[in-house]
């Protein structure tokens, strides 16, 4: 603001005391703008709005500022002095206003070129911010220099698209170097790059073809080698079989000779020595095998008796019956060796099954069943998963108690003890009791102990709980009935009735007394 006022003060020629004006400005701190600073002529975009202000300042005319807008007293004094001097008459002077002239064609062209350069610079800066240092060149001549080369690449490309011959992709365009400013360099670079790319692609394709050929040759060589090895192995295998057979025969002959020599050399053992040797053998087997030692010794004894080990598979009663039925149907088809293979049993065992007439008793079967249960507890236990159906017990319909049932029983027992002499009355009472028992039979749905043992506590916990609650309630009701009956009987002990007529009279008297 200070500079602006100083510049404009030089244009005012009619001010006599310029020193006073400048000293006041230097000593005062202005807090309010008197006039707005106009923009320079070469940058101004709003010339029309600021034209009047510029003309007034150039001609020495300053707009008066009201006192209310000023902030300090010093500014007020300064503005008063200026207003007094401005009101004084003005000498006529030549206008320093520049005369406007029409620009020539050369000037217009220069301005247009400068504007275009500025726009291009701005666009380049924006593109550099988006794409980095490398900026794509979109000149008009780009489609001409690489047209032939690009068509050749298009024809060689396997993944080409039909109808896209004239289309130029961004990847095909070269990147400008900022250092190369000449147009000749710009046109010469892309041609060299396209040729180099084309040659590189051809070289890569040739290398791939060579590698494929080498790979195929390697596979052929490996296949041929494997065939030769297989043939060689087959020949060796046949030769080895023949040699092995000969060697085995020789080995067996030598073994038999050695065994014969050893048998001859071994001395005969006495009974005591045999028992001692047997004990030693049993001790060794027990140390090595533990619990399985008894089974192994049992098999050794069978081997001595029968000359064979124990069978591979044990046969059940149902299997034995099936063997007999099959042999009866077709003895020519279901022969002993066929059955031995199917059931995995020795020939001697099948012959025993077919010719035996022994049938076990119930005691024997009971013992066998116990052994099965002890050996296979998981299979035969009531808690197993397979026996869930057996554990099922219904308690949906529980027994109901009738009070008359217990009262009639107890009354009849007392009457029989008291009235032994009256046979007729006793007979009538017994007949009545039989009829009442048939009507009111007490049949509680009690679970037997055999079923209770089978119940799984995890699945049938609630069922057992209901049963226990039912049993407890039943005992409570019985106790209540007994107590009530004793009260009634104590009252009746004092009365000794001889006949039914006297009994009725006594009952009526009791009711009246109550």
UniProtKB/Swiss-Prot annotation:
- The residue stretches assigned to a coiled coil in this entry are 192-296, 398-429, 462-511
Q: What is this protein called?
A: Putative neugrin-like protein DDB_G0288135
- Chain positions covered by the region annotation Disordered: 85-143, 171-214, 238-279, 402-437
Q: Return the Basic and acidic residues bias intervals.
A: 193-214, 252-279
Alphabetically ordered keywords of this record: Coiled coil
Q: Specify residue ranges for compositional bias: Basic residues.
A: 88-100
> Could you tell me where the Acidic residues compositional bias lies?
120-132
**Which family does the UniProt entry place this protein in?**
Belongs to the neugrin family.
Keyword NADP carried by entry: no
Give the matching InterPro entries. NGRN/Rrg9
| PANTHER family in the record | NEUGRIN (PTHR13475:SF3)
Which range is the signal sequence, renumbered to this chain? Answer: none
Q: Compositional bias of type Low complexity: which residue ranges?
A: 176-186, 240-251, 402-434
The source organism is Dictyostelium discoideum (Social amoeba)
């Amino acid at each position: 603001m200070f500079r602006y006022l100083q510049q404009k003060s030089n244009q005012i020629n009619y001010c006599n005391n310029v020193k006073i004006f400048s000293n006041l400005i230097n000593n005062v701190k202005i807090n309010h703008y008197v006039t707005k600073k106009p923009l320079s002529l070469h940058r101004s975009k709003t010339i029309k709005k600021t034209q009047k202000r510029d003309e007034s300042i150039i001609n020495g005319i300053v707009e008066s500022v009201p006192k209310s807008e000023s902030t300090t007293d010093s500014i007020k004094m300064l503005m008063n002095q200026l207003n007094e001097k401005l009101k004084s008459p003005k000498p006529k002077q030549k206008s320093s206003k520049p005369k406007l002239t029409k620009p020539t064609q050369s000037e217009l062209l220069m301005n247009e070129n400068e504007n275009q350069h500025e726009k291009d610079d701005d666009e380049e800066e924006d593109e550099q911010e988006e794409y980095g240092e490398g900026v794509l060149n979109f000149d008009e001549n780009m489609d001409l220099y690489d047209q032939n080369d690009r068509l050749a690449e298009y024809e060689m490309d396997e993944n080409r698209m039909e109808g896209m011959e004239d289309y130029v992709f961004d990847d095909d365009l070269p990147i400008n170097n900022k250092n190369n400013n000449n147009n000749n360099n710009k046109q010469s670079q892309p041609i060299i790059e396209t040729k180099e790319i084309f040659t590189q692609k051809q070289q890569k394709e040739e290398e791939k073809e060579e590698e494929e050929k080498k790979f195929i040759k390697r596979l052929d060589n490996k296949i041929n080698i494997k065939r030769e090895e297989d043939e060689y192995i087959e020949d060796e295998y046949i030769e080895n079989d023949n040699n092995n057979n000969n060697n085995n025969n020789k080995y067996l002959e030598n073994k038999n000779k050695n065994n014969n020599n050893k048998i001859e050399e071994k001395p005969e053992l006495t009974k005591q020595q045999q028992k001692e040797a047997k004990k030693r053998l049993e001790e060794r087997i027990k140390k090595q095998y533990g619990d399985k030692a008894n089974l192994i010794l049992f098999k050794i004894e069978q081997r001595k008796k029968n000359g064979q080990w124990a069978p591979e598979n044990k046969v059940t009663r149902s299997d034995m019956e099936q063997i007999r039925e099959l042999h009866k149907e077709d003895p020519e088809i279901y022969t002993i060796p066929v059955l031995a293979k199917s059931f995995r049993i020795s020939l001697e065992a099948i012959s025993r099954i077919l010719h035996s007439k022994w049938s076990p008793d119930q005691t024997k079967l009971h013992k066998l069943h116990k052994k099965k249960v002890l050996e296979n507890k998981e299979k035969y236990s009531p808690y197993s998963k397979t026996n869930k159906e057996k554990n099922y017990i219904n308690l949906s319909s529980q027994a109901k108690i009738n009070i008359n049932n217990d009262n009639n029983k107890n009354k009849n027992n007392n009457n029989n003890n008291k009235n032994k002499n009256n046979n007729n009355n006793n007979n009538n009472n017994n007949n009545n009791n039989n009829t009442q028992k048939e009507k009111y039979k007490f049949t509680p749905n009690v679970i037997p102990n055999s079923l209770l043992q089978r119940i799984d506590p995890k699945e049938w916990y609630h069922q057992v709980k209901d049963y226990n609650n039912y049993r407890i309630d039943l005992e409570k009701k019985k106790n209540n009935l007994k107590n009530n009956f004793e009260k009634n009987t104590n009252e009746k002990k004092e009365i000794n009735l001889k006949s039914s007529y006297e009994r009725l009279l006594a009952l009526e008297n009791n009711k009246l007394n109550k």
